[in-house]
Amino acid sequence: MKIAIGIGELSGDIFAANLIKYIRKNYPNIEIIGITGPNSFKQGLASKFNISSLSVRGYFDVIFNLQSILKFRNNFLNFLLNEKPDIYLGIDAPDFNFFIERKLKEKGIKTYHMVCPSVWAWRANRIRKFKKTFDYLFSIFDHEKKFLKLHKFKNFSYVGHPLAQDIPLLPNVNKSKKILNINHKGKIIGLLPGSRPSEVVWNTDVLFKATVLLSKRYKNLLFLVPVTSKNNLSFIQKKLFETKIKNIQLIHGHSHDILNISDIAIIASGTATLEAVFFKTPMVVYYKLSSLSHFLFKFLLKSKYISLPNILSNKALVSELIHKQATPENIAIEASKLIDDVSHRQQLIKEFKDIHKRHRLNTNELICNQLFQ
């Protein structure tokens, strides 16, 4: 049997890598092909199709790169039609994967999609297209069960979140400190401006300016920044030089270890906010994007919140600073509240534990039981 896996961004690559590892251990005769990334490559998925070709963010970033994205998509589809996999699993990236899934489904190939599109936040009418697009959906957030049933979509199962199973309920902080060789005695603050190059460009400057303000107020702070690529590294180093901050360390990768040892984190909204929840790290969420993208974002958004901690708890657990609200001053103010208020941090940790438990299932086993039944 042959399975093809399609991913479009780093978070999907992490999910794919975990699933590939499980398949190779428990279903060694399954052949795996598809799009690769840094994590899935380590699990043996070598491919000429790489997620680096799809790393754009925002409506207008997509428009500016549309020709190259469409070329990549069409080449990948032709590759799959030639390979004729028994199963196609699209992981997230719905605007990319839905096209692939629909074309393969028309050819009689069994199609699955992992990660329900955020239909509960915007474009709820997409649910009507699910049946024509793929055969089965794997939902990873528990609040989606009620929403999908309400809209009478039945071909799905809730499988929990892959990271909730990978990350212990009580992570080993000392182990992460040893891995990072960090012995700092003061407060540690994780800074996560995003993983895609466009995210880093939009979010780094305001973040570093906020650290200048925080460093003036608090002594002995250490800021840690996980860097995911050489392109991101060069841009972040440039901004670091411009702001002349001395108490920031850039670390290649290790975002999980950084979140684990951080007293608080300041995060550009995205999957990293959920990772912070699973590591029980209190956070401030901010999000910078172009004015045009922000206009469309506000027009389409139906959810009251944008960050996963708030969406999953259905309340304002963490501060959200969006677009023009995401100033260095506002970020520093919200971060200061977390630093100063121990009881608030403890309450957040309690709430995060509850979210973690609700999403901690045998995800890969549940997926494979459905794929290979």
Label the predicted regions:
Residues 1-373:
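Nucleotide-activated sugar donor-binding and catalytic core shared by glycosyltransferases
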